[in-house]
């Protein structure tokens, strides 16, 4: 296969289809989404069988546990894919909304209209649910999509794509509104991220290496996050029962996600009381703690097993482990915690546990992250939990889309000017 010609063809078809989907009405888009959801429910057994084949090949290829976790589907996750499509269908259509319309002294009215971005290229590893989520979000926001999933999920992605095509056909929309790249040749990625005549934005979802490559080589804008070094800070005015519960969920509910907590900061004034409780819980869950000298001394004195303790090195404060490991540090106070987070964090999601309203407000204002959380788990940093329906990704850049990216993040705004024969004086 001539990969360059193949990708150029996909790009041309997507650009043409983007004009059709941009003018599609809400009812037509929702009909496509609901048909896709019904097809996924009907074909659940086929999707799970394809996923089982992908899992078998991935294990044989030696993929790590974090990727296998993201790759695996279950009856529950397939049902969740269908539910996500139905939720997106139920969301308000942002396309065509006019914000801030106001009269100017000249008599004209000026406002901003929400419009699709155009053609979105989405590159992702594992996570077959992204095929459905991305297709749905792009479609509802009036965009065409070119989806390039990882080779490890090829069979399942193809099965999901068949359900997507069925929905497009039922709604009378061009099949090229959502196209799945069928080749596993990595050169396809290089072509996709440089097709500035056909692609308006790239959304990568995958490991750090993939994101760095795309960021360095892309010739079109990229909506991205590099990694997720999320923090929980336990303040000296925290409810310790809440703190233990929050850290347990934030760290151990699921290891392979970007909103999993990787670093625990504890105020010095409460460390002797908080760390033994948190350490016992983490050790019981099989989590290794890489601590500063002060935290290790407290944990050792509390009887936390030695095989779960290890001295932290400088790189641990930056690390996204994606596994049963957490960095632990005792800090002076809220100011020190915020300095640490803003220095070592990834600007993804960071949380404070405190009963002090003023400190919570400071944390919200001063921590420079896409999501900041008070008295709750970092695991809530998710489009579904935020009421966006599904999300197409998470952005840690300071652009129009920051944090979980849903429908509005896949639109732009253009100025609209309304007059009645007005001319400029």
Swiss-Prot record:
Family designation: Belongs to the gamma-glutamyl phosphate reductase family.
Location, primary (coarse class): cytoplasm
MF annotations from Gene Ontology: glutamate-5-semialdehyde dehydrogenase activity; NADP binding
Pathway membership, UniProt: Amino-acid biosynthesis; L-proline biosynthesis; L-glutamate 5-semialdehyde from L-glutamate: step 2/2
GO cellular component assignments: cytoplasm
UniProt KW NADP keyword: yes
Family annotation (HAMAP family): ProA
Keyword ATP-binding among UniProt keywords: no
InterPro entries: Ald_DH/histidinol_DH (IPR016161), Ald_DH_C (IPR016163), Ald_DH_N (IPR016162), Aldehyde_DH_dom (IPR015590), G-glutamylP_reductase_CS (IPR020593), Glu-5-SA_DH (IPR012134), GPR_dom (IPR000965)
Localization, UniProt: Cytoplasm
Annotated protein name in UniProt: Gamma-glutamyl phosphate reductase
Organism: Thiobacillus denitrificans (strain ATCC 25259 / T1)
Protein's job: Catalyzes the NADPH-dependent reduction of L-glutamate 5-phosphate into L-glutamate 5-semialdehyde and phosphate. The product spontaneously undergoes cyclization to form 1-pyrroline-5-carboxylate.
Superkingdom: Bacteria
Pfam families (alphabetical): Aldedh
Keyword terms: Amino-acid biosynthesis, Cytoplasm, NADP, Oxidoreductase, Proline biosynthesis
Coiled-coil region(s): none
Catalytic activity, reaction form: L-glutamate 5-semialdehyde + phosphate + NADP(+) = L-glutamyl 5-phosphate + NADPH + H(+)
EC assignment: 1.2.1.41
Enzyme class: oxidoreductase
Example GO biological process: L-proline biosynthetic process
């Amino acid at each position: 296969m001539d990969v360059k010609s193949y990708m150029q063809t996909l790009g041309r078809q997507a650009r043409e289809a983007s004009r059709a989907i941009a003018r599609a009405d809400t009812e037509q888009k929702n009909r496509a989404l609901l048909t896709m959801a019904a097809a996924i429910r009907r074909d659940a057994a086929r999707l799970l069988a394809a996923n089982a084949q992908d899992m078998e090949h991935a294990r044989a290829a030696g993929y790590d546990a974090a990727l296998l976790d993201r790759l695996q589907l279950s009856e529950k996750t397939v049902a969740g894919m269908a539910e996500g499509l139905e939720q997106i269908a139920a969301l308000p259509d942002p396309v065509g909304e006019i914000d801030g319309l106001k009269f100017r002294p000249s008599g004209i009215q000026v406002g901003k209209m929400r419009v699709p971005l155009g053609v979105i290229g989405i590159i992702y590893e594992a996570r077959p649910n992204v095929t459905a989520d991305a297709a749905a979000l792009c479609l509802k926001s009036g965009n065409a999509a070119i989806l390039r999933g990882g080779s490890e999920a090829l069979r399942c992605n193809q099965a999901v794509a068949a359900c997507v095509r069925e929905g497009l056909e039922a709604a009378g929309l061009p099949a090229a509104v959502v196209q799945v790249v069928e080749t596993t040749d990595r050169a396809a990625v290089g072509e996709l991220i440089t097709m500035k005549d056909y692609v308006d934005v790239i959304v990568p979802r995958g490991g750090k290496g993939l994101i760095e490559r795309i960021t360095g080589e892309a010739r079109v804008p990229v909506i991205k996050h590099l990694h997720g070094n999320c923090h929980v800070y336990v303040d000296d005015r925290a409810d310790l029962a809440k703190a233990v519960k929050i850290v347990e969920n934030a760290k151990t509910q699921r290891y392979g996600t970007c909103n999993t907590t990787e670093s625990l900061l504890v105020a010095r004034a409460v460390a002797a009381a908080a760390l033994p409780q948190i350490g016992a819980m983490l050790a019981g869950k099989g989590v290794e703690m890489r601590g500063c000298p002060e935290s290790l001394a407290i944990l050792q004195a509390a009887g936390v097993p030695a095989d779960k303790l290890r001295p932290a090195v400088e790189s641990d404060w930056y690390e996204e482990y994606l596994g049963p490991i957490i960095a632990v540090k005792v800090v002076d106070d809220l100011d020190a915690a915020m300095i640490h987070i803003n220095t070592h964090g990834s600007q993804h999601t960071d949380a404070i546990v405190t009963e002090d309203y003023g400190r919570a407000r400071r944390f919200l204002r001063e921590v420079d992250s896409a999501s900041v959380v008070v008295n709750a788990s970092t695991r809530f940093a998710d489009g579904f939990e935020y009421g966006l329906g599904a999300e197409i990704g998470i952005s840690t850049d300071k652009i129009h889309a920051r944090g979980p990216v849903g429908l509005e993040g896949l639109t732009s705004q253009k100025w609209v000017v309304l007059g009645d024969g007005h001319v400029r004086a």
